[in-house]
Amino acid sequence: MTLLERLGGREAITRGIVHTFRILSRRPRPSRHEEAAGEELDAYLRGLGLSPVRDGAGNRMADVPPAPGRGRAPRLILQGHLDMVCAVRPGSGWNPLADPVTVMEEGGFLRSDGRASLGADNHLGNAAALWLLSTGAVNHGPLRLLFTTAEEVGLEGAKEVAPDWLARAEYLLNTDGFHLGRAVVGSASGRRETWAAPLDAGPAPALPAWRLTLSGGRGGHSGDDINRGRANPIKLLAAYLAGLPGGRIASLSGGLTHNAIPAQAEAVVFCPAEPDLSPLRAALAGYRAADPGLTVACAPAEGPERAWTPAFQAHALAFLMGLYHGVYAMEPAFPGTVGASANLGRAGTEGDVYEVCAFLRSTRPEWEAELAGRHMTLGTAHGFSLSVTGYPGWPGDRANPLAAVLGRVWWEQTGRTLELSAVHVGLEPSVFRAKAPGLVMASAGPDILDAHSVDERAPLDGLPDYALLLAGAMEAL
């Protein structure tokens, strides 16, 4: 009997993974708030007869005994993360701390109801691995399941994983990939920058107030989508406001988090007459192909009592316009892969501070240093101070033995060659390298489109192929 037959066929695989994904999605799980989702996972693991262990960071680990006759096989760690980037559609009322994702199947895709991101990153990979184990049909060796927290805010959970949790294992397969048919053997470093300047405001001028809104952008993942030419509404609106005659800003905000491309931005501005939006519309025209849903609107606003001082306004706008956003360099060792980039992800007022969030990624230290130095010079010149966290890169290795196993399995199952790649995202193997130097690691995931956005979705027809790849690798090791 073939592996596909043992798993019940393609439709049964799809149904099983989707059902498991729905179970895992029943609890809210924004980064640093994964405890309820972790309890849901614990219950699922106990239902499989396993004994999950939790550490102080909320990470979970559970050992899975080998199938009969496979006790001498090398131990494989299957690893994913619990948290998700909670992109929220403006005006939807969705609360990431209280509301679970509404999971839907529509047009051949798994997606949310459009109010929020789906969270297939990374729970779809987790669901595939867990469903396979629930079937009892996979002839695997000793396994360890490892689920981390706060991956989306700088791999924080991975940094707290004890080396003992990685010990006595030969291989680690990370399920946090976005492209079916690809094995990832390297990833970019990440530098999470939070810039802050004391908000300097004074009495509002005696002028009409207007609310300017840029909305409908596609947004997306600041690593996986940074090369797609999508607009950054924060930068577009800042550039427009810098050229608005007589305009005084009361507020300027946009975006959600460091590592998501912003999909919207909004400003309230005092202006003698209704602002002429034609320069902004002309700027949007350059993004019509990559960001067709972008729209701009202007409406009268209830005037706030205070507005930014002219000096603070000039500095803040110059800082926003000067921050690098987009691809900085391509990686020649892996043609077609972005080597370095920066994302201006969020801007807005926090109490009496104006805060700006950026995320730098790089496969090479010198590129990250160049971008970081450029930002530091800019921030210092305009009165912004920096708080920074980060994580190392994972150097790509084309001779990766685990990727070779995945490649053989993929060829046997599909007749196609598995792509070998480094990726322009942060992956937890970059942190695990120092904790377990001899551990052979690779990453492979299902297809996920527009992660970190309300348009996030996953094609259903690829789920059986992904499950068969995972199961085949478990049996081949």
PLM features per residue range, with description:
Residues 70-148, 152-153, 159-160, 165, ...:
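Active-site metal-coordination/substrate-binding segment of hydrolases
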